[in-house]
Amino acid sequence: MRLSTLTQAVALITATLMLTACGDDSDVSTEIIDGTPPLLTTDSNFSSGYSAVAAVFVSGQVQDSGGIKSVTYTLNGRAPQSLTIDTNGYFNDRILLDLGENSIALAATDNAGNIMRSTKNMYLGDTVAAGGSHTAALHDGQLYGWGRNNYGQTGTAYTSTFTDTMGHPELPTLMNNAPKNLISIKFNQNHSLAIDNKGQVYSWGNDAYGQLGRGQSNRHSCVKSADCRLDISAIAGIDNAVMLAAGYNHNLVLTKDGSIWAFGANAQGQLGNNTAINSSIPVKVDFSASEGVGHIIQVVASSSSSYALDDKGQVWGWGSDASANLGRSQACDKANNCINITNKPVRINVIAQDLADSTAQRVEKEIITQLAAGKDHVLALTNKDSVYGWGLNASSQIGYNGIGFKNTVNAWASTITAPTKLPWFAGQEVRRVYANGNASYVLLDNVAANNSNTRASDGILYAWGMFGETDGKGKTSYENLNEPTNKLTSLKNIDNMTMGTMHLIAHEKPLNQNNGIPFKNGNLFTWGWSFEGSLGNENIAY
């Protein structure tokens, strides 16, 4: 806040005494030149790092006793755009991101022309990926893959197994037949997707349900006849892609204009095109009956359900509701057998006051800013760092249904039928939520250390739901964690992570060099079920 007192240390004051020639009479004039920029504050959503959402919600306040002229943002060096501020200096808006690298500069200008700037760098896309048992990472736009390869899903252009004498990618292997300009990758089960720097989508691996989106012809035979594609090739009909979502046998692609394209299995209506027919080519998700839908900024997919987040903070879902996936306060049982599938998007009311309000009304309002989906459960993160969950909870992936709770009066139900606020995150800085299979994770910043003399840490992962641990003899045991637990105490400073079905890969934020400039690349860490080389370590072969 800019103070108006003359003693303010940063104020530039020029005093000019003008004495008249008339005896002892004199006039004293003091000119105060305002050289102090306004105070600009933003919430934690405006921060550097990887983004799971194709927009950033920018909320904050600008203060200056001399008045505010404007608040603007500049995206990737383009012309400045204005943000609307109310009479108290509050602003709240969303900025759509480009695929890949983004630099956003906020500038608050007061009536004296002083400017306060805040610049953040964000990356829209995933540079690490994990599927059923295959894994990959991008380095300088090139694809490195490893792990299970029975459908050619790593990108080798051939199939292989761990017992082959040569050629199986048990360590990170450069896939020379992949495009050299990739920005984002997404895997699930035994298929793979990628986007290049022009927004073109590529696919390879298992195609038994048409989940590669490349039509019916020219398939290869891997496990069965005509069930895969070994070549990494483009999907026709989709331009300007910015995000991928990989379900178990279907996929979603979000484009720059907010459209969603879907392909693959559709028996539960998970393609959202008002049918229950599989499609091997992209079909557009039908929002024509979705009243009040905003610009879609995120897509996620589960086993047979699909979800979207719009720029109003509204959540939409379609497909299977067998485990209360759509959060409609009812589970599928004999009374409600879910024969009638939901094949078009429906609104999921996550927060009680979740309405399509105006920008001004949203300044103090809690809204959803990020989604994650596991096999049959969903997590939603808000701008207030709250996390909501619903759906399948048999493994305590929502919470309190694991060892010590399950089958007791204190246990949560095995199906959470409506979005429920999870009780563990008050006062925490939740940067990301993750889910796959029957497990959940959050990425926390500013985590206090046990030792009061040690500074707080960023990039700490907490897990709950199904979690496996391996002892010194190589034996792995699984337990269902009731609540978020820091099981990975050696991991810190993580800036992105991807969950496979039962294994994970995380990227460490690059450390600074002596000159303060970050190294270009951080370390990669893998853990979980090691099968066919999925962890990228040749000494692990279970």
Regions found by a protein language model. Name each.
Residues 10, 23-39, 43-44, 121-542:
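Eukaryote-biased RCC1-like beta-propeller repeat architecture
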Residues 18-21:
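C-terminal motif of bacterial Sec signal peptides marking the signal peptidase cleavage site
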Residues 63-70:
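Extracellular acidic loop/turn motifs
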